[in-house]
Regions:
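Short, conserved beta-strand edge motifs with alternating hydrophobic and charged residues
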Residues: 84, 112-114
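Ligand-binding loop in jelly-roll beta-barrel domains
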Residues: 108, 115-131
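Non-catalytic, conserved peripheral segments adjacent to functional cores
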Residues: 1-106, 125-127, 134-190
Length: 190
């Protein structure tokens, strides 16, 4: 299992070893012990989620109140996504920066986000199925969003804006600076 950091502290891409033969494949896609050894993150799964998206679906930027926050381990069981990590932690050396990685069922790779990071993804294929392992249960009162099309963040997408499908929640979410001014963003704990 290869675990490499992204440009945002607390985010990583995990690429597992694929064991294949004439019968198919076997993949060990999550190992808490190896993740902790490589990243220092103590990832205790509290909930597993699954979403199925049409091509062009853009979900996020989502984040939870800290504490307790919600670390995520995100992989595709079918299709592919362009996955975004946004540093929304006030005081972080990379505050306001973002990074992305392609996560796909064919590569069996995953992205890991520590508590306090913003997360979004763009489905690159129809029927893209994303599986999330998270460290805290979903709590609607503690969940927030930032508009992923906010110009202050400047996220770049693999598809043109006219092809993006967003929920009403994400479309009406505040921009990055408005969320900061409202005191919604977590504080850097580094």
């Amino acid at each position: 299992m290869d675990i490499r950091p992204l440009a945002i502290p607390g985010s990583f891409v995990v690429t597992p070893k694929i064991h294949g033969d004439d019968r198919g494949e076997f993949v060990e896609w999550f190992r808490a012990d190896l993740l902790k050894k490589a990243t220092g993150l103590d990832f205790s799964v509290a909930q597993a989620n699954l979403s199925v998206s049409a091509k062009g679906t853009l979900r996020g930027i989502h984040f939870a109140d800290v504490p307790p926050g919600q670390a995520k381990y995100v992989m595709c069981s079918s299709g592919s996504i362009e996955d975004y990590v946004v540093d929304i932690r006030v005081g972080s050396p990379t505050f306001g920066a973002w990074d992305r990685a392609i996560i796909s069922a064919s590569e069996r790779n995953a992205i890991v986000l520590d508590v306090g990071l913003g997360h979004a993804f763009l489905a690159l294929e129809d029927n893209t199925t994303v599986t999330y392992l998270v460290t805290d249960q979903f709590k609607p009162h503690a969940e927030h969003a930032i508009n992923p099309l906010d110009e202050d963040l400047g996220l770049k997408f693999a598809l043109p804006a006219r092809e993006l499908l967003l929920s009403e929640k994400d479309t009406s979410a505040p921009g990055f600076l408005a969320a900061q001014a409202a005191g919604l963003l977590p504080t850097w704990q580094g």
